[in-house]
Amino acid sequence: MKRILSLILAAALSFGVLALVGCGKKEEALKLGLGVHSTATVTNATEDVAGAGQATMTVAAVLVDENGKIVKCFIDCADSKVTYTADGKAVANASFATKYEQGDAYNMVQYGGAGKEWYAQADAFCALVAGKTLSEVKALVASDNKGTDEVINAGCTILVSEFVLAIEKAVESAVESDATAKDTLKVGVSTAQTTKDANEDADGYNQLETTFFAAAINGEGKIAAAKTECVQVKFTFDANGASTFDATKSILGKYEQGLDYNMVQYGGAGNEWYVQADAFCSAALGKTAGDVSALLGSDNYGTDIVKAAGCTILVDGFVKAASKAK
């Protein structure tokens, strides 16, 4: 009898040890935030030089812990320039690529005299802000909008003020998610352009619609958490190529506008844009970039999975941006 009890006790102890080893420490769930800071500049067309509208959209994605400290950060910048002629014709761009996407082809070292390319400096800044709170990140901006000595010594010598403004929006909008510190944080960016020539009765336009998709990718290559935003900038001009766009106004993303975007009131939608964007992100959870591409649907309005999740708007921008977040 004693031998039987001893065997039972030994088995119980062994099971307990194995259970403890197998469980391990559970990774802390982190908040995911996405922020976009946008500015615009314009010029008038002349007989010799096309007029231009340039939108600089700096995006930051962050993973934030329960103490408000940034665990991971990713930064990119969509610096998109469109043009129009002195006779009021809009010019279509062949393609758009962000500064990070361009990599070495951005040529900041060769033409700007920088020590490192833009993407390397952005990565250096992101590495530096890991472990810092928002207030500590704000303190990294020097009086000339470049970074403090701490930033420069980390390998980032370019202007960082817009990095910080984007990070501020990202941290302040961060929401609970299933992302952990083990996940890879990425942002995909896709830009669509629509144009219309001007005439004597109506202005023309050259419009940019840039979609940002932030994703925390787990070890299986699947999306553990996601957030999306879209910034629409409509550069207008008259029949003589003179800009009629007000570059002094603030540029806010559709998500950032919230109820003020008024898609329900003016577009007849069932839910506001930010609600539908969240619904798409929910449908993307647990999927790979390839799986997300399959959510497009034949009419660009999403598959039944997307619609059932509560997203009934065009999703091609979401899908194209998400496919790059890998």
Residue ranges of each PLM-predicted region?
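Positively charged n-region of N-terminal signal peptides that target proteins for export
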Residues: M1-A11
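Intrinsic disorder/low-complexity segments
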Residues: A11-L13, L20, G68
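Sec-dependent signal peptide cleavage junction
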Residues: F15-L30
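N-terminal cationic amphipathic segment used for targeting or macromolecule association
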Residues: I8-A10, V17, V319
